Amino acid sequence: MEQYEKEEKIGEGTYGVVYRARDKVTNETIALKKIRLEQEDEGVPSTAIREISLLKEMHHGNIVRLHDVIHSEKRIYLVFEYLDLDLKKFMDSCPEFAKNPTLIKSYLYQILRGVAYCHSHRVLHRDLKPQNLLIDRRTNALKLADFGLARAFGIPVRTFTHEVVTLWYRAPEILLGSRQYSTPVDMWSVGCIFAEMVNQKPLFPGDSEIDELFKIFRVLGTPNEQSWPGVSSLPDYKSAFPKWQAQDLATIVPTLDPAGLDLLSKMLRYEPNKRITARQALEHEYFKDLEMVQ
């Protein structure tokens, strides 16, 4: 740790405190994430160290770079490249963003590039949300933070400061208790983020797991064996769920053009293996005029 000098606390993430710090060797500003482990007394699990070490090999322009992993008996520090703006802060401070379909398209494309890269390396995120999409103010590059951390450390129900970890971007198969989920969970989150960029408000802002499910069902219809084969055998599925009819997405995201609505509907498919992949999404016609954008 001697190599890094903490300058100020910049946030409290899902896993612990985040500091802005300086690398004394290179004089570079970095983000230092202190991971608080659930079982404090047991020290750092070797599986977590292995998982995290793999993430150091991830190099992509749309992934926040993990420079270093420092671990002592009791805790882990992760050293990341430093970016001071995230998509949530950007949307909150810049309401006119919704009127810039070109920038929305560019950001969505970059999110998908980062997700496609991670999925091609068999790494899931599981907790994608606007707060962990970081923006470089100078270049408008968007980068995904915290990829792979869920597998190493699990996703707590509450952060270490007792804030509830958001459910707004969580895929229905996870909410219904599936243990067999895979890369489609991240594509669901991307769909929720896409709609939020366009509408300037969250698509499914549930405040509990059941409220989250019902907010989804009210828009997409309550799933059944016809719309989602196998749904009734998921652990937390109840035949007594209220039966809502699907709404037209065009009424939910009224300013999105037809190509965008088509892409969004493919991201928000109930059946995980029918959900569009990141690779497929990058080829979607919604992006056909992107060359002029970038």
From Swiss-Prot:
The keyword DNA-binding does not apply. The active site is at D127. GO terms for cellular component: cyclin-dependent protein kinase holoenzyme complex; cytoplasm; nucleus. The keyword Transcription regulation does not apply. Pfam families: Pkinase. GO terms for molecular function: ATP binding; cyclin binding; cyclin-dependent protein serine/threonine kinase activity; protein serine kinase activity; RNA polymerase II CTD heptapeptide repeat kinase activity. Its EC number is 2.7.11.22, 2.7.11.23. Keywords: ATP-binding, Kinase, Nucleotide-binding, Phosphoprotein, Serine/threonine-protein kinase, Transferase. Phosphorylated at Thr-161 by CDKD-1. It comes from the Eukaryota. ATP binds at I10, G11, E12, G13, T14, Y15, G16, V17, V18, K33. Expressed in the dividing region of the root apex and in differentiated cells such as those in the sclerenchyma, pericycle and parenchyma of the central cylinder. It catalyses: L-seryl-[protein] + ATP = O-phospho-L-seryl-[protein] + ADP + H(+); L-threonyl-[protein] + ATP = O-phospho-L-threonyl-[protein] + ADP + H(+); [DNA-directed RNA polymerase] + ATP = phospho-[DNA-directed RNA polymerase] + ADP + H(+). The modification Phosphothreonine is found at T14, T161. The modification Phosphotyrosine is found at Y15. GO terms for biological process: G1/S transition of mitotic cell cycle; regulation of G2/M transition of mitotic cell cycle; regulation of gene expression; regulation of meiotic cell cycle; signal transduction. Residues 4-287 form the Protein kinase domain. Belongs to the protein kinase superfamily. CMGC Ser/Thr protein kinase family. CDC2/CDKX subfamily. PANTHER family: CELL DIVISION PROTEIN KINASE, CYCLIN-DEPENDENT KINASE A-1. This is Cyclin-dependent kinase A-1. The gene is CDKA-1.
